Structure formats: structure tokens, C-alpha cells
């Protein structure tokens, strides 16, 4: 959350330290060996959790959120600070683009309702059947 503030306060090198810290957390023991995490761009990451229910994925997201919140990161000038993150969770339903869009909507709900939380995407409405 407020990643731009980190860059504006301590510079892009410290922003990179935050991104590397989060990447190391994702590669560490917070995810299972068959989970897959990757950076989408900027400060956005995606985590694929195969064989996981929406409730289990939300719990994993909460574990990640808490771990980052409790971390202490050191800026280039030696200042120690903490960061938080908002997480949007969406079960795979249909194609990957639709799932990412649902996760993104849940992420923005988390940001718009106070940040530093995990939000599970609401089920997509069923599309009306097409007639020939």
C-alpha cells in the first residue's frame, strides 16, 4: 500500500528493496512448494494457488499480508520502516484474464475500504446465454 510514498520518500532504490523483500517472502516458506508467484509489473504480484479453495486462498493471503506488515525494511539512509499490502483473491473461473480482472476488482475494494486487508472477489454474474 502507498508504494509511491516509499519511492517519493526514500527513492526508487528503496522501492526496489521493498519489491525484493516481498519476492523473497513469496519464495520463502509462506507458500507451498507447488504454488507459483510472479510480478505482474510495478508493485503488483500474482500468486497462483492450485488445488486451493477460495477460503484457503484468503487465509494464505492473510498470512502473507501479516508477514509483510510485521517486517522491518531498511531504507538506504538506514531508516527502518514498515509497509502494508492489500490483496485481492479470486478463484479461477473461466479464463485467466477474467480471473485477474476479478482479483483486481477485489484488490481495489481492499484499497478503497481502508487498505492492508484481503478481499475475496464476489462471484461473477452468470452471463446470459447467447442465442443463435
Feature map (PLM): residue ranges:
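Catalytic-core segments of nucleotide cyclases and related cyclic-nucleotide turnover enzymes
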Residues: 12, 58-61, 90-132
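ATP/adenylate-binding site constellation spanning eukaryotic-like Ser/Thr protein kinases
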Residues: 42, 84, 115
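Residue-level recognition of strand-loop junctions within catalytic nucleotide-signaling folds
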Residues: 8, 48-53, 69, 92-93, ...
